[in-house]
Amino acid sequence: ADFDGDGRTEVAFVETPHIGGSLRLYEFRDRKLREDYAVRGFSNHAIGSREQSQAAVHDWTGDGVPDIAVPDARRSAIRFVTFADGKFREFDGVAHNQKIVTALRPAMLDGSGTVYAVYGLADGTIVAVRPNPGR
């Protein structure tokens, strides 16, 4: 996806999610894969867990550039981030007393067209968050 709005496709991933993970964006430029951004403090799965889908992509800010929802390094908060206009910005987040343990998915739940980030916590709670892009 074009995560920064520059017209080029980037690949987003969390490197070393178990030890102070970094959210990184790379793009193919000048016939090489080049790092565009690296921001520490993220995770997308727990050691030993088979769940490998703890991140979601959707344009929550409505600016035409995909945003990313991903847990913090401890997996006890969800962070909503954007790289629009070439700048990293965290525009919302929700902290929890339990770890995030399920996949994280964008979902329309009520027919209004609003897209929520949906995921589950270690105590069995299902969470649906509608991020506030203006925060």
Language-model region placement:
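Beta-propeller-forming repeat regions
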Residues: 1-135
